């Protein structure tokens, strides 16, 4: 148990400090290349660099890889691959105008590592009903939950940085 607590503290610290270090570097990099957009939440012509999620992504991946070194199991590997695929979909969606169907369908395919690596348990334990095995329903839930979660996080980011507090 103590080993898991130490790993959690280290992984959390790596995520925090990676984002803390990379965000100013990313801001300068994006501003030099004039990759800025008007901030719709501020009065005047305040420009902000975009896409800023790259530093959050780097922090998440750094922490997930560190976690994998502590606990080399297929579930963590599936999360790493799913995160990379999901980020790729987000970058494509930000950079190119795609149809409304693109993001949900692409994010559904991002669930493939979870399914292919068997990073799930289709047995559910209910206090009142006991153990229930629902493999087909669980597979469908995994495929639908990745796009739902991705679009929900994207939707709640109505103010700059709200989603970053949700994800870290």
Q: Where are the regions a protein language model picked out?
A:
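"…together with the soluble PPM/PP2C metallo-phosphatase catalytic core" -> "…together
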Residues: 2-168
């Amino acid at each position: 148990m103590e080993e898991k607590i130490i790993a959690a503290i280290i992984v959390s610290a790596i995520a925090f400090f990676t984002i803390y270090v990379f965000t100013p570097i990313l801001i300068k990099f994006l501003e030099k290349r004039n990759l800025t957009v008007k901030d719709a939440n501020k009065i005047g012509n305040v420009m902000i660099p975009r896409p800023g999620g790259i530093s959050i992504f780097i922090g998440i991946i750094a922490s997930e890889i560190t976690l994998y070194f502590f606990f080399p199991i297929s579930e963590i590997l599936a999360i790493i691959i799913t995160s990379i695929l999901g980020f790729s979909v987000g970058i494509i969606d930000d950079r190119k105008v795609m149809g409304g169907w693109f993001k949900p369908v692409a994010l559904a395919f991002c669930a493939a590592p979870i399914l292919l690596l068997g990073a799930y348990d289709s047995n559910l334990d209910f206090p009142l009903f006991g153990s229930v095995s629902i493999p087909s329903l669980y597979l469908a839930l995994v495929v639908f939950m990745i796009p739902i979660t991705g679009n929900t996080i994207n939707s709640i980011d109505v103010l700059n940085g709200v989603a970053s507090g949700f994800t870290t």
